[in-house]
């Protein structure tokens, strides 16, 4: 199935049914009072997050979604039946905005979460509501109100804990295969990864995280070159970025340090907040060097990069170093979770102190 991460659709709620102007017509009651019932409410359109979906491709076949109209009111004070709601399944991680105004409507971040995107109209009132001491036979009624109608822009941003960043052919997809059950396409040429891939990495009982592999970046990506820039947004919700570098490129003209600097520059041009995210350096393909040459090669790379953060030496193909990397990532994410909980508790305590005793 083709990966589709943006789409525009049309949603229309159901209009409310009209109220009814009716009078009692019974034997021996020639001039019965009003008995017109109310119209039914129109159905609304909802979006619902479904963890079983991972693309917006289904919207290629259907772009307009309409809820049911409310039925009109009837005599004998019978109310019209309300219209059925329309529910549309979307992948978890979908961002919803108004396609015409750009206004953000909401995000669907949890399985089963629902978002109202087009409210149905209200049913009109029947003439029974307009009876008064001065108007015993009102012919007034109100029509149902119109429902919301709007164009929506849906944008899928994958939910992952960890994002992989790097040049084409750096070995990101091979790393995903090495540490997870995902099986992205792997081959010895650039741009093998054409769409983002997600993998679940398990490091023990009830301990796992989600990793996202996006297409590789090239110089000029922030201006639209290559394949990766359109998928950089999928790293926006990650908490940790692994910068994968081909430490031993087969092309002698290719410089790993120059490649790394280009990636960092493109990242900064795309998003300052993403560039400031915690980033670990992962030096891949070191198994291509004789063991006695590896330390000197790594030290030279780190010195030229002026890198002072975490660094890992791995071979994604053989699996060397990948288990330790996955374990350390899991430990770091758990520390982040604990830090977030503590920060939330501090914020709640400070809020209670500001509010004072009741």
Curated annotation (Swiss-Prot):
Residues 341-358 have a biased composition (Basic and acidic residues). It comes from the Bacteria. GO terms for molecular function: GTP binding; GTPase activity; magnesium ion binding. It is found in: Cytoplasm. One of its GO terms (cellular component) is cytoplasm. Its EC number is 3.6.5.-. Residues 1-159 form the Obg domain. It holds the Pfam family MMR_HSR1. The keyword Hydrolase applies. Residues 337-358 are annotated as: Disordered. One of its GO terms (biological process) is ribosome biogenesis. Residues 160-334 form the OBG-type G domain. Belongs to the TRAFAC class OBG-HflX-like GTPase superfamily. OBG GTPase family. Monomer. This is GTPase Obg. It comes from Alkalilimnicola ehrlichii (strain ATCC BAA-1101 / DSM 17681 / MLHE-1).
């Amino acid at each position: 199935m083709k990966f589709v991460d943006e789409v525009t659709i049309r949603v229309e709620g159901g209009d409310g049914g009209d109220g009814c102007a009716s009078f009692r017509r019974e034997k021996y009651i020639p001039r019965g009072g009003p008995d017109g019932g109310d119209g039914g409410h129109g159905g609304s359109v909802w979006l619902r997050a479904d963890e079983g979906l991972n693309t917006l491709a289904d919207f290629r076949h259907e772009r307009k979604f309409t809820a049911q109209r409310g039925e009109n009111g009837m005599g004998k004070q019978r109310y019209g039946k309300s219209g059925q709601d329309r529910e549309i399944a979307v992948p978890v991680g979908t961002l919803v905005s108004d396609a015409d105004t750009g206004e953000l409507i909401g995000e669907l971040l949890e399985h089963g979460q629902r978002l109202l995107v087009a409210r149905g109209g209200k049913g009109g009132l029947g003439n029974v509501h307009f009876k008064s001491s001065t108007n015993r036979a009102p012919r007034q009624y109100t029509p149902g109100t119109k429902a919301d109608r709007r164009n929506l822009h849906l944008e899928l941003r994958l939910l992952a804990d960890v994002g992989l960043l790097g040049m084409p052919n750096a070995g990101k997809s091979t790393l995903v295969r090495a540490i997870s059950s995902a099986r992205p396409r792997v081959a010895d040429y650039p741009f093998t990864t054409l769409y983002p891939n997600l993998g679940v990495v398990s490091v023990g009982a009830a301990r796992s995280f989600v990793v996202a592999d996006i297409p590789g970046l090239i110089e000029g990506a922030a201006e639209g070159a290559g394949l990766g820039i359109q998928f950089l947004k999928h790293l926006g919700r990650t908490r940790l970025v692994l910068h994968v570098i081909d430490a031993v490129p087969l092309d002698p003209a290719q410089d790993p340090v120059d490649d790394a600097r280009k990636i960092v520059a493109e990242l900064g041009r795309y998003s300052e907040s993403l560039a400031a995210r915690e980033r670990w350096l992962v030096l891949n393909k070191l198994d291509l060097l004789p063991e006695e040459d590896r330390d000197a090669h790594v030290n030279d790379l780190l010195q030229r990069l002026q890198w002072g953060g975490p660094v890992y030496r791995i071979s994604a193909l053989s699996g060397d170093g990948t288990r330790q990397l996955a374990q350390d990532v899991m430990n770091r994410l758990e520390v982040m979770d604990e830090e977030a909980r503590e920060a939330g508790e501090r914020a709640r305590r400070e809020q209670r102190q500001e509010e004072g005793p009741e």
